[in-house]
């Protein structure tokens, strides 16, 4: 069995300073080559030069062992370079091509697909008139006797997407067990209030169209509902009995814009 010579006997003599490292083996008959690694040179204080002596066309096992031992000496030398994050970043920049990341915005339907929070409630104006459904799409305000209170409309008030400001909360008002929502549309030059039939598979939803959205504002023990689509227009009732609920442009006058809200248990 062949024996491996002791590395210390075959170790190349070497000389190093701040700028170069020189390795020699086997005497003057050998041909010398000089290698300077440009990338490594840029990573430390000085360049690293490695001179390896080898006989032309005769690479003996002994010389290979000598090179390995010399490289171990180089790796453990006092001038060994400490590998930093910047070094890894510079290497990776040559391997991988940097590409810009493009963010695509999704539609509001996907961004706002969380379940809609809602409460059931009844509304009476400050004159204690109740809101009732007088015909399929007409909402009226009138006084009810105790035995008639079952006619009172129950609203499903949904909290929808919109800007909350000055204690104003965006809500939509639908009628319980009906596919009807209060909405604001313009007839001629005047905004008006109507009951609009909707698809129950789609509504209610977080991102309601603006015509369905009202700012709910609490004032002492009452609430008022301002149209988001038409600012300063409010859900209103008349002083006169059994008149349709409408969209009014005046507060604190003959038109009643403040309501008492009774929240019902789920």
Swiss-Prot record:
Instruction: Tell me if Cytoplasm is a UniProt keyword of this record.
Output: yes
The protein's matches in SUPFAM superfamilies, at most eight in alphabetical order, are given as:
Cytokine (SSF50353)
Ordered alphabetically, the record's keywords are:
Cytokine, Cytoplasm, Inflammatory response, Lysosome, Mitogen, Pyrogen, Secreted
Primary location recorded for the protein, binned into one broad class? cytoplasm
Chain segments annotated as transmembrane: none
Propeptide residues?
1-113
Would you tell me the protein name for this molecule? Interleukin-1 beta
Which organism is this protein's natural source? Answer: Bubalus carabanensis (Swamp type water buffalo)
Lineage, uppermost ranks: Eukaryota, Metazoa, Chordata, Craniata, Vertebrata
């Amino acid at each position: 069995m062949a024996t491996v010579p002791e590395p210390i006997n075959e170790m190349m003599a070497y000389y190093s300073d701040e700028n170069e490292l020189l390795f020699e083996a086997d005497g003057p008959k050998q041909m010398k080559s000089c290698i300077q690694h440009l990338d490594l040179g840029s990573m430390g204080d000085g360049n690293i030069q490695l001179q390896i002596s080898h006989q032309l066309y005769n690479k003996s096992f002994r010389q290979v062992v000598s090179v390995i031992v010399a490289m171990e000496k180089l790796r453990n030398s006092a001038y060994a370079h400490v590998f930093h994050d910047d070094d890894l970043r510079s290497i990776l920049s040559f391997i991988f091509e940097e590409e810009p990341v493009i963010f695509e915005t999704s539609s509001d339907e996907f961004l706002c697909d969380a379940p809609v929070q809602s409460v059931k409630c009844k509304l009476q104006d400050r004159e204690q008139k109740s809101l009732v459904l007088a015909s399929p799409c007409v909402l009226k305000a009138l006084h009810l006797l105790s035995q008639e209170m079952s006619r009172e409309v129950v609203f499903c008030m949904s909290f929808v997407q919109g800007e909350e400001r000055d204690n104003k909360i965006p809500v939509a008002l639908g009628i319980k067990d009906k596919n009807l929502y209060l909405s604001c549309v313009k007839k001629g030059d005047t905004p008006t209030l109507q009951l609009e039939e909707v698809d129950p598979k789609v509504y209610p939803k977080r991102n309601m169209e603006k015509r369905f959205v009202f700012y709910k504002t609490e004032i002492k023990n009452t609430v008022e509902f301002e149209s988001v689509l038409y600012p300063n227009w409010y859900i209103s009732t008349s002083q006169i009995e059994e008149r349709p609920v409408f969209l009014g442009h005046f507060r604190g006058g003959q038109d009643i814009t403040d309501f008492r809200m009774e929240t019902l248990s789920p």
